[in-house]
Design a protein with these regions (language model features):
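Short, structured loop/turn "capping" segments at alpha-beta junctions
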Residues: 136-139, 165-170, 184
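AMP-forming adenylation/ATP pyrophosphatase catalytic core
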Residues: 1, 8-10, 39-41, 55, ...
Length: 233
């Protein structure tokens, strides 16, 4: 199958435009055509790392819709996965939010598959592969700036590793949380199937009927059940 390569140039740094062109030239040596999409935003509006990620994902999604592509491959690695977990923890995410970073998920609104094939590789692994395959690596200094939450979390994880939180223990904890989340999802589905019915008049226009037993569950099960039913109608 054909692959299309996209690099989003956010213009967050003075050197980013040159780096994007260097990347394009390097990939061309390997017969890879890379499309560069530049983020054009008003100068008086401050760009953040979070805004950049949101924009980048919209670019990928819109590009896939235009080109009728059904799968997006993202370059997230294990370090990203770990950082994302602690960022969500610091923001007060619930169990479902903490375990929502997966190798695969489907965007139902556009039926686009999101695949992260590199989650089992550390940043150090990928750095080694990149240097030895392409002899080329772009270092983003903002990754070390404590101005950004992700960088501060990265520093925190380094200290946690020194105190015993290695990759094996982290993955074990994450798998335990997934198991707990799956148990809750089981009872959510049970609650919906036994204590509710949905009548669809037409697409995105329907009614839901709930029995009193629907509300006899824990708050988390009731909330998740409500959310799923609302998505259906």
């Amino acid at each position: 199958k054909k692959f299309e390569y996209i690099h989003v140039e956010h213009k967050l740094r003075d050197t980013s435009s040159k780096e994007a062109q260097d990347l394009k030239k390097m990939l061309k040596k390997f017969m890879i055509e890379c499309k560069i999409i530049t983020w054009k935003k008003k100068k008086n509006i401050k760009k953040t790392q979070s805004d950049s990620r949101d924009f980048r994902f919209k670019v990928f999604e819109n590009y896939c819709k235009t080109k009728k592509i059904n799968t997006i491959l993202l370059g997230h690695h294990f370090d990203d996965f770990q950082e994302n977990f602690f960022i969500r923890l610091l923001r007060g995410s619930g169990l479902k939010g903490l375990v929502s970073f997966h190798n695969y998920r489907n965007l139902q609104r556009n039926n686009i598959n999101i695949v992260r094939p590199l989650l089992d590789f550390s940043k150090e692994d990928l750095f080694y592969i990149t240097k030895n395959t392409f002899n080329f690596y772009i270092d983003d200094p903002s990754n070390r700036s404590l101005e950004y939450l992700r960088s501060r979390v990265r520093f925190m994880i380094t200290n946690l590793k020194k105190n015993g939180l290695d990759e094996k223990k982290f993955k074990m904890t994450f798998e335990n949380l997934i198991s707990s989340n799956n148990s809750i999802e089981y009872f959510v589905q049970k609650n919906i199937s036994e204590n509710s019915s949905v009548s669809l008049l037409k697409k995105n226009n329907g009614k839901a009927f709930l029995s009193l037993e629907f509300f006899s569950n824990t708050d988390e099960i009731i909330l998740r059940s409500f959310t799923k039913i609302l998505q259906d109608i």
